[in-house]
Amino acid sequence: MELITIVHPNRDDYISIIFEFKDKVNKHILVYDKSDNEYAKELKKAINKLNKVYNLKSKIEILQIDEDSKSDLLNALKNIKVTQDSYLNGAGADIALFVFLSSFILQNNGKVLAYDIADNSYNIITKNGFVSKNIENLMSIDDYITLNNDTIISEANIAPMLKHKDSLELLFKNVTKLYELYRLIMKQDILKIEFDYKDLAKALIELEIIDSGYNLKVAGNFLGYLLEEYILLNVIDFDFDDIKCSAIISFDQMQVKNNNIEIKNEFDILVIKDNKMGFIECKMGVSSNAIETVYKSDSIMEYFGEYAKSIIVNLQNSKDKRFQSHLQYKDGIKFRAKTKNISIYNDYNFNKKEFEKLLINTFKVKKENKFAKQLKERTLQNLNNKFNTLGDYLWVILKSLLL
């Protein structure tokens, strides 16, 4: 199979097709206007990375054209030898260029792939008609990041977090009490902790946040870290294709330059569903400027494409004198966020049903612990690969029961 991709800045329009047919393509031809030269170079690097990850051998050719020059377009056709195994991947491209190449390829018995990012489906068009297909090979977060020529520098290990659920449920049952316990730990009011908050303190000891003497074992404000884990444990019950926690991404230089984002960004929770990326920001307390948090999320989200979405989760302290009478994300801020595909969960306590409703409406997911099952299977496989004897195998089975 020969895949001819028209390269342009909106990568989400064509990387799903590249991934869908990665195992069938033996040759990529990247066609691009001279103004998109850098994007073509980045995509070539990204496909080479993908080939390395999946041990693929596809060749890559690049073809620069001036889409405003008719003679240049006609000359370009001489470098494309169309067969019945040639497919054009041109969603989102310049219309004139797409029509020109589509006509040429169809006339020579090739095919055109028309990808619909909203439905994550595509049509295979021939000169005799078309057939509709759904994308079958869904990208993981790693795949998506690879095809954007970015790098995940680090991420948290989610598997151990699954064992923290009971402790976190107890801590977030009453957020006001959690804030008060935090204040007492900072003051080292041992008697008050022993008398009124011993069960919550025990949960923090189990999570290795404090020691048995109620001294901090972690640096900084641990409330945000706890919220991140707690939200993660609520998210994994839904049918996302992949989830990452505390992931730091190093973005490619083109995205840094064009989207005005930082070279590196840390995401509390990253998710992907049907090849569309999203993220969740977890914040405890009040920020200096809530609208700035919305604008920051929007600027980062632009990188993930127009169908990316995010949620900001903010749990406030009901005893904070600055915001006792109102929440910091007022209706005007929520409306502005909604226009940018950002949902807001802002309250004094955590209502699981309300959060799940927001999660479903934002990311179009349903409750099904697909990712949790995959995580357990991967953990078991990793364990199984380490052991060979019958005794060791039985130990693996025991481990699986404990997950």
Regions found by a protein language model. Name each.
Residues 93, 97-109, 333:
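Short Gly/Thr/Asp-enriched flexible loops that form oxyanion-binding sites at enzyme active sites
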Residues 140-403:
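Intrinsically disordered, low-complexity Ser/Thr/Pro/Gly-rich regulatory segments
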Residues 6-9, 59-73, 283-286, 347-350:
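Short beta->alpha junction loops
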Residues 1-49:
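N-terminal beta-strand-loop-alpha-helix module at the start
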Residues 86-90, 105-126:
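Short, acidic/small-residue loops that bind anionic groups at enzyme active sites
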Residues 5-10, 32-35, 90-92, 284, ...:
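Structural motif
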Residues 28-83:
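A charged nuclease-like catalytic/ligand-binding cleft shared by nucleic-acid processing domains
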Residues 17-21, 39-53, 101-103, 322-340:
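Short, aromatic/basic amphipathic alpha-helical patches
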